[in-house]
Structure formats: structure tokens, C-alpha cells
Amino acid sequence: LDDGASLTELPSLDLYRMPDPFRRPRLSEFKDRYDVLEYAVTSLATFAEPLAFSLRANRELARRSNDFDIVHDNQCLGYGILKIHRSGLPVLATIHHPITVDRRLETKHATTRWKRFTKNRFYSFTRMQTKVAQKLPRILTVSTNSFDDIVADHGISPDRLHIVHVGVDSSQFIPLPEVPVVPGRLMTTASADVAMKGLAFLLEALAKIRTENPDVHLVVIGKPKYDSKATALIKDLKLENHIEFISGVPDEKIVELYSTAQLAIVPSLYEGFSLPAIEAMSCGVPLIATTGGALPEVVGDDGVTALHVPPGDVTALANKIRWALNQSSLRETVGQQGRLRVISNYSWHSTAEKTVEHYYALLDSLEQTNSAGGTK
């Protein structure tokens, strides 16, 4: 954290912690009613953290309401956030994309009826998020695509929704020309091993390409889940020796890894924005990205700042990778133009400035409302 920021941790049961997710807590771990609620909701196969965290946050802020001018909720959207709003503390929320999209994709790609049922149970908290989002006066999102999806899925009035792009530190995510490129190296980031991220499609494409080019291999920033489709595919396609998962490394190492790659891939079925895409572009690595969700508006024109493929199409993805590996001049040009696009459009400084503008706009609108109502 910056020296000017302090962190208040809100203890929880941490029921999803590794290596024992969905554990049964000891009785001595239950300290209050929110711990009981967290365990009870999780026992019903529903993701409890948005509700439990928001209620704990409301309790903490009720004790310290005079310490803060505004509360910025980062897509928790639990009932506790609504309580904070109703207490009189100004609340602004960021919704990167509606989690209802994740729910649809996860249930669509579930392989059995039981898995579809459990996915629907897990994502049932999205109904709460819709109710809370509809009550908040000002919401930020990160792309035009997310804007449209939030309006459609959450039923939010467009005049309460505003776009502020997220960014990347282009002075940190930089090309490293002194680092040698490894022939055939592809790189991707899987922030979560879920259907929406499209890793399974990339693995199938990799297997296709390797029948012709045995040098092709994949580096994944992230961890596979032990029971995921991707984990099963790696074994079924005999890719164990041709894929490497790396996690828990600093940004400096990620930049170095990008510099060794011939291509970066974002195979997602949907993205509300995609930080991995602009991080790769900022490093000057030529990017292949699907047209899922907001990716086309983020990465720019096909063949200019990135290369596009349709989402969920293994053959198209394999063909694009195969073709791009044989186009050294195009890769260099796309990599250079991609970095220029990021520098021109996506900086954290700009994100911060625009976010602060919305803080003031929210405070001003509330002051006007209170003045009109005769309150202070």
C-alpha cells in the first residue's frame, strides 16, 4: 500500500482457503453471528463472502463513520453495502462486469445436471448484487460493453452508470529487448480457472499446433483447479511436459516472462475489460485475443494493435496462432502498435483522476439533494 493508505483487515472464517477449501471450522473459531451466517450460507453451496464481508464492513464503518467522506465498493454489492448507504455515508461502487455473465457461462459449460445445479447455487448471490446495485446513486464500470451488460442484467438506469477505464503502469510493464525470445513460447494469464477464461480452448488449440510444431509450448500465469476441465485436458491431451503454471511471482518476473514469449493469448469467452491483455500489450508482446465481451474495444483493431479470433473456436484459435508464429514482421509491428495504444489510453494516473472526479460529483449531488431537502 501507499504510505498514505492504511489497511483494516476484517477477520472471517476464510472457508475457501487452500489447501483445505470448504473446510469445517472448529467451534472455537465462531466469534459472532456473522461467522455463523458465513458458514450457514456456504453450507448451502452459495458463495457467502459478498454478504458476510459487507455486513462486517458495515459494522466496522458504523464505529468509524466520522473518519470517512466516501465509501468505494469494489463489486462486493452485499446487503451490508446497502446498509452503509442508508446510514448516510456516501457510497460509490465499481462493477467491472455483471457476475450474472459468469453464472450463465458456468452453467452453460457444466457437463452434468448436478454441476449445473451447483453452479446456479454458487452464483445465487447475484440476485443480491442486482438489488443493491439498483439502490446506489453512482456506479463506475470499465468499458462500454460492461456498461451495456450492467444495464441489461442489473436493470440500472444508464444515467447512474459511468465509464472509467482501468490502467497499467507502462513504465513497469515494458519491453525487455535484452531478454531472448524463446521459439514457440505462448503466454497467457488465467486469473481464475473457470470456463469464462477459455483456458480449455487454448489447451485444445495447443495440442493441434503441436502435431506440426513440437517447439510450441505454453506458460500460464495462474493455478489450475484440481477438478477443472483444464486440468483434465492437460492429462488427456498429454500436455504435462509442454505447459508450465507459474503463480505467486512479482510483476517484475511477469514482465520478464512476457519478454520471452512470441505471442500472448487471451482466450476468454468474455471479459469486462482484461488487465492481462493490456499488460501484455504494454510489454510489446503481440497479442491474440478473442472478441468476447469488451476485448475488441480494449485491444483495438484486428491486425493493427492485436489479432482477433472468435471466442470458443478452437480451430480458429489454432489457425491464428500457427499463422502468427510464421509472421515475424507482423508480430513486431502489432507488438509496437499495441504498446502505443496502451500508453495513449490506459494509465493508472488517468484512472485515479477520473475516479476522483466521480467522488466529487457524488458528494456534490448529495449536498444538493440535502440542501433541497433542508438537511445537512
Which residues are covered by each model-predicted region?
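Short alpha-helical donor nucleotide-sugar binding micro-motif in glycosyltransferases
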Residues: 248-249, 256-261
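Carbohydrate-associated surface elements
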Residues: 145, 167
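Nucleotide-activated donor-binding/catalytic signature segment of Leloir-type glycosyltransferases, i.e.
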Residues: 230-249
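Conserved acidic donor-binding segment of nucleotide-sugar-dependent glycosyltransferases
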Residues: 301-302, 306-314, 323-328
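Membrane-proximal helix-turn-helix segments that form the acceptor-binding/catalytic region
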Residues: 59-62, 99, 116-139
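Short hydrophobic beta-strand element within catalytic cores of glycosyltransferases
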Residues: 286-289
